[in-house]
């Protein structure tokens, strides 16, 4: 029942899962507890100490609703490959994690509950990892790899992604993490001047 944002941060092929502070968990804690004061206290502890402990009664509610497992990048790529071969469905890396953990659940639990896995993103947002999952090597830049994925699978590239190559890049600045407080101060000063 301990949530600790001080843990090591790992980058994976599923970047939406690479987080240290989960706002979805905050909402879930409120939905299950109905106690905004408790959730505010936990979030304050997280902000000030980097960690909090979920009370036993709330942890019991979480455990009654959820089953958890782990899936690394290799497992996700293997899931992408098996889903493609067995179901001819091209899934993204996040969905592959869900699929892999769903298979773990089915192996470890004889309750015969139905399992629903919802796709959360286009495989074309992660074309290199998806290509590797179906046994191909990615070649070229992200746009080349999207075309390669389409050529290998026949799955259409979404129009919003297919048109990106010819669009103008709007944001070119890269700010190093160490420079962020300075950049934030600069932006706030600029915003203030703009409204004067």
Task: Give residue ranges: language-model regions.
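Glycine-rich phosphate/pyrophosphate-binding loop at beta-loop-alpha junctions
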Residues: 1-46, 118-134
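Short beta-alpha connecting loops at secondary-structure transitions
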Residues: 7-16, 62-65, 167-169
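Alpha-helix initiation and N-capping motif
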Residues: 21-25, 36-39, 59, 73, ...
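Active-site-adjacent helical/loop segments in soluble small-molecule enzymes
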Residues: 34-112, 170-177
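Catalytic phosphate/nucleotide-handling subdomain of diverse soluble enzymes
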Residues: 100-164
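Long, charge-rich low-complexity segments
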Residues: 159-184
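Conserved small/polar residues in nucleotide/adenosyl-binding loops
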Residues: 185-192
């Amino acid at each position: 029942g301990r949530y600790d944002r001080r843990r090591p941060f790992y980058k994976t092929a599923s970047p939406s899962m690479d987080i240290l502070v989960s706002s979805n968990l905050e909402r879930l804690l409120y939905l299950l507890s109905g106690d905004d004061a408790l959730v505010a206290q936990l979030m304050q502890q997280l902000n000030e100490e980097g960690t909090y402990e979920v009370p036993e009664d709330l942890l019991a509610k979480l455990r009654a609703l959820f089953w958890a497992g782990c899936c690394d990048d290799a497992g996700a790529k293997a899931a992408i490959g098996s889903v493609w071969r067995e179901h001819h469905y091209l899934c993204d890396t996040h969905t592959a994690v869900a699929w892999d953990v769903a298979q773990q659940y089915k192996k470890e639990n004889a309750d015969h509950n139905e399992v629903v896995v919802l796709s959360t993103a286009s495989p074309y947002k992660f074309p290199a990892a998806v290509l590797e999952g179906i046994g191909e090597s990615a070649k070229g830049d992200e746009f080349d790899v999207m075309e390669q994925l389409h050529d290998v699978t026949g799955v259409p590239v979404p129009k919003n992604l297919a048109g990106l190559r010819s669009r103008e890049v709007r944001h070119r600045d890269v700010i190093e993490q160490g420079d962020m407080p300075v950049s934030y101060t600069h932006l706030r000063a600029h915003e203030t001047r703009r409204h004067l």
